């Protein structure tokens, strides 16, 4: 069984930065060992000047998928939801994965969970905690692992 992880980089970064930080190398190891992930996609923004961070993540065997950013009134805007959904769905149709791990709390991904369930592909959601997990995801009746409860494994 091939297991791919799809990480909503904005959600993970935003939440971990505001709470407790994350060691991406340890997080990758956790995904590989606990969930047997053979490929880990990290969807994130591309900001000029952050190339060393991207190289570091790539060296840790993350497959980086970038979204171009837009600066509006001095704030950087971006969203990789569509890219994550397209990559996950295409992986199923190309017979590259049979199980998915999705790291997010965003209810916009409820349709992706429905897709995996319809295709009878096991799916596990990793969300920050109960209050940072959309009701739309919670009601999908899939395994949800709360990162706050296992954060000691990747801090």
Regions found by a protein language model. Give the residues of each.
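Acidic, PIN/NYN-like endoribonuclease modules and their adjacent C-terminal/linker elements
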Residues: 113-155
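Domain-level signal for Mg2+-assisted phosphodiester chemistry and nucleotide/NA-binding surfaces
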Residues: 1-80, 118, 122-124, 130
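Internal catalytic-core helix/loop-beta-alpha segment
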Residues: 72-103
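Acidic beta-strand-to-loop metal/phosphate-binding motif
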Residues: 41-45, 99-105
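Short, well-ordered beta-strand core segments
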Residues: 63, 100, 143-145
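A generic secondary-structure signal
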Residues: 30, 87-91, 115
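Phosphate- and divalent-cation-binding pockets in alpha/beta enzyme and binding domains
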Residues: 52, 87, 111-112, 135
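Well-ordered alpha-helical segments embedded in enzymatic catalytic cores
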Residues: 26-27, 83-87, 108
């Amino acid at each position: 069984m091939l297991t791919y992880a799809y990480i909503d980089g904005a959600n993970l970064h935003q939440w971990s930065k505001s709470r407790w930080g994350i060691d991406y190398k340890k997080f990758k190891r956790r995904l590989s060992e606990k969930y047997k992930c053979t490929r880990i996609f990290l969807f994130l923004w591309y900001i000029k000047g952050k190339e060393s961070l991207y190289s570091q993540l790539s060296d840790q065997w993350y497959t980086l998928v970038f979204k171009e950013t837009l600066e509006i009134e001095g704030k950087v805007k971006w969203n990789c939801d569509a890219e994550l959904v397209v990559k996950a769905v295409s992986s199923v149709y190309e017979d590259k994965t049979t199980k998915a791990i999705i790291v997010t709390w965003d209810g916009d991904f409820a349709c992706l969970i429905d897709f995996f369930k319809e295709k009878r592909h096991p799916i596990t959601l990793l969300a920050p905690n109960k209050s940072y997990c959309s009701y739309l995801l919670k009601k999908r009746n899939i395994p949800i692992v709360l990162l706050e409860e296992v954060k000691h494994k990747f801090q």
